UniProtKB/Swiss-Prot annotation:
Molecular function, one GO term: phosphoribosylanthranilate isomerase activity
Keyword Isomerase part of the UniProt annotation: yes
Catalysed reactions listed for this entry: N-(5-phospho-beta-D-ribosyl)anthranilate = 1-(2-carboxyphenylamino)-1-deoxy-D-ribulose 5-phosphate
Family: Belongs to the TrpF family.
Keyword Amino-acid biosynthesis assigned: yes
Keywords of the record: Amino-acid biosynthesis, Aromatic amino acid biosynthesis, Isomerase, Tryptophan biosynthesis
GO terms for biological process, alphabetical: L-tryptophan biosynthetic process
Coiled coil location: none
Protein name: N-(5'-phosphoribosyl)anthranilate isomerase
Naturally occurring in which organism (per UniProt): Lipomyces starkeyi (Oleaginous yeast)
Enzyme's top EC category: isomerase
Enzyme Commission designation: 5.3.1.24
């Protein structure tokens, strides 16, 4: 694996939050995508009572610019310019994370919680679903899976270890040599600065890597993660 010494563009940074407070911290720190895990019965699944509040918090934090015209540092990677920027004029965006749920459930939650992006972590039939889901789709893959970089099936490829969201690190040595993608799996405050310099990594997706005993450490890990990922 070759790691460049400088970053040519601002990477996308996505973080999953459990609470409104976590979303506030992530946004003020520079998050581009705020994820809500909507898979039932996982440790990091967002409680139903908090979903709407987190979604609303993304665009209603006083003093935090949500429009590029008001100075927010939008991610500059070409993957974002070609995928998200034409559709959205404000940042950050809300991402709903699903795994092997029905299409009806995905569409219902998309409408109910004003999701900007759908992220699929299971064995969903992309050929059918991407025609039905009216927002960009981030699709999780493991290394070597079929359709990993197939054009037209999904907006963004996410490479992750295991089922995803479990902190299982993916082998960086086997990452694709072409085509932009987002990287997840075992990313932490300590290694994210290296991860964003790997060729073709357009962004990072972090969840358990900013947790302390299962709870997000808002003042330390979260803010430090964004400083390291963005190079601020």
């Amino acid at each position: 694996m070759t790691v460049s010494t400088t970053s040519l563009c601002t990477p996308i940074v996505k973080i999953c939050g459990l609470t409104v407070e976590a979303a506030h911290c992530a946004i003020s720190s520079g998050a581009d995508l705020i994820g809500m895990i909507l898979v039932p019965d996982l440790k990091r699944t967002v409680q139903q009572t908090k979903l709407k509040a987190i979604s609303r918090a993304v665009t209603r934090i006083p003093g935090v610019p949500t429009s590029p015209s008001r100075g927010i540092d939008r991610p500059s990677h070409g993957l974002v310019r070609g995928t998200f920027s034409a559709d959205y004029t404000s940042w950050p965006l809300v991402v709903g994370v699903f795994r092997n749920q029905s299409l009806d459930e995905v569409l219902r939650m998309l409408r109910n919680y004003d999701l900007d992006i759908v992220q699929l972590h299971g064995s969903e039939p992309l050929h059918q679903w991407t025609r039905e889901i009216p927002v960009p789709v981030i699709k999780k893959f493991g290394l070597g899976e079929d359709d990993l970089m197939a054009p037209g099936l999904h907006a963004v490829t996410l490479l992750d270890g295991g089922a995803g969201g479990e902190g299982q690190k993916i082998s960086w040595e086997g990452l694709p040599g072409s085509g932009a993608f987002m990287l997840a799996g075992g990313l932490t405050v300590d290694n994210v600065a290296v991860a964003v310099k790997i060729p073709n990594v357009a962004g990072v997706d972090v969840s358990s890597g900013v947790a302390t005993d299962g709870m997000q450490d808002l003042e330390k890990n979260c803010r430090c993660l964004f400083r390291n990922a963005k190079g601020w």
